[in-house]
């Protein structure tokens, strides 16, 4: 009798489809991206307030994202065997510690490494949040709700960031991040301890061979490297074209606000349009949006480009993660997909930094566009194999 009671309690604790778990994941996931979601403004803040070069500023955010990527690799390999509550609590404390240390040593040589440490904590939080949101029965809806919250924060964060930095400087911003991460420990109580295979059943799942799963992961990696490159340099692209900082911030605010509409559109259209159509439109449209920024765009063209990029990014991401989840019956694929996502977002700035030559961003933008196209082609390969298996069932 006691064993049955314990089993019932265990099942309640790992119900990833329950609203307490979903809401906690959405809130904690937003805490995990406090820095990343306003990264273009952070880059400009480093240039203006730490007096570093454009390339060094991009490199600094790249180090933070490298920490995120390392954490998600760790999580993909061993993290799912550890109590999720312990992981999230540790991630919050590491992120808070890294942010606080960064605030106290913003001009020190070790600043970049402190950002990497903060990024490692952020990556632990992000990995768990994305993993159990992504494996829920209504993955597209839940990922989209996640995006709505973090984009709402990002929109206002980018809009007000120049003013905030003028008042409290970079160090003050990191103190705020540390405080929010500490407060978020309250939400750990609502995080499930793990997940069970029973919660992973989805009618569209077909198990693909390992080689095709690897191709799918390479597609996710290429797509997110492109996103990481673009997101790191957007502010610099605008200012290098002669647009003032506040006008660039306004354009990015508008793009974040409209990206909320993109995420909501994925909720409303998830069951109304073919997933493959949504993915094609999102990825190829993202490439076209970056193409609008080639050369020296004016305010209108810059605004159109960044808005298109951000809307489509947040529209297509739930569809991509939903598609990836359909390739693997065990549900473990989602952990690796999140790792590839974070490696790409972290590697993007590191790839972009040496391509910035002080003369413009054309090379960076062309590499970004090429990676979008490569990701689309790669994702089609396992998608077609999945379609054949689904038709034969």
Task: For every predicted segment, state its role.
Residues 86-100, 277-292, 366-369:
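Structural signature of the two symmetry-related core transmembrane helices
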Residues 327-361, 368:
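A late C-terminal transmembrane helix in Major Facilitator Superfamily
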């Amino acid at each position: 009798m006691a064993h049955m009671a314990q089993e019932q309690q265990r099942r309640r604790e790992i119900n990833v489809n329950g609203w307490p778990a979903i809401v906690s994941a959405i809130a904690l996931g937003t805490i995990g991206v406090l820095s990343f979601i306003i990264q273009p403004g952070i880059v400009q803040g480093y240039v203006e307030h730490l007096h570093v070069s454009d390339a060094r500023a991009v490199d600094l955010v790249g180090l933070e994202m490298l920490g995120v990527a390392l954490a998600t690799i760790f999580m993909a390999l061993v993290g799912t065997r550890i109590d999720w509550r312990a992981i999230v609590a540790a991630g919050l404390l590491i992120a808070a510690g890294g942010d606080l240390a960064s605030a106290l040593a913003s001009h020190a040589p070790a600043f970049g490494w402190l950002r990497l440490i903060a990024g490692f904590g952020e990556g632990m939080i992000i990995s768990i949040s994305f993993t159990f949101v992504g494996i829920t029965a209504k993955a597209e809806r839940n990922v989209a709700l996640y995006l709505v919250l973090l984009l709402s924060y990002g929109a206002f964060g980018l809009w007000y960031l120049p003013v905030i930095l003028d008042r409290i400087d970079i160090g003050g911003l990191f103190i705020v991040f540390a405080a929010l991460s500490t407060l978020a420990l309250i939400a750990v109580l609502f995080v499930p301890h793990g997940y069970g295979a029973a919660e992973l059943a989805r009618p569209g799942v077909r198990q693909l061979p390992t080689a095709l799963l690897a191709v799918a992961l390479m597609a996710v990696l290429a797509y997110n490297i492109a996103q990481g490159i673009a997101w790191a340099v957007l502010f610099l692209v605008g200012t290098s074209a002669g647009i003032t900082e506040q006008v660039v911030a306004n354009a990015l605010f508008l793009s974040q606000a409209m990206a909320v509409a993109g995420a909501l559109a994925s909720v409303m259209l998830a069951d109304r349009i073919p997933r493959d159509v949504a993915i094609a439109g999102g990825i190829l449209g993202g490439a076209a949006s970056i193409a609008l920024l080639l050369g020296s765009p004016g305010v209108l063209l810059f605004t159109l480009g960044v808005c298109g990029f951000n809307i489509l990014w947040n529209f297509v991401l739930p569809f991509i993660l939903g598609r990836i989840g359909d390739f693997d019956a065990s549900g473990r694929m989602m952990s690796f997909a999140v790792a590839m996502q974070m490696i790409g977002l972290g590697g993007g700035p590191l790839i972009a930094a040496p391509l910035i030559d002080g003369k413009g961003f054309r090379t960076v933008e062309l590499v970004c566009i090429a990676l979008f196209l490569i990701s689309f082609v790669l994702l089609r390969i396992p998608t077609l194999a999945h379609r054949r298996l689904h038709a034969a069932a």
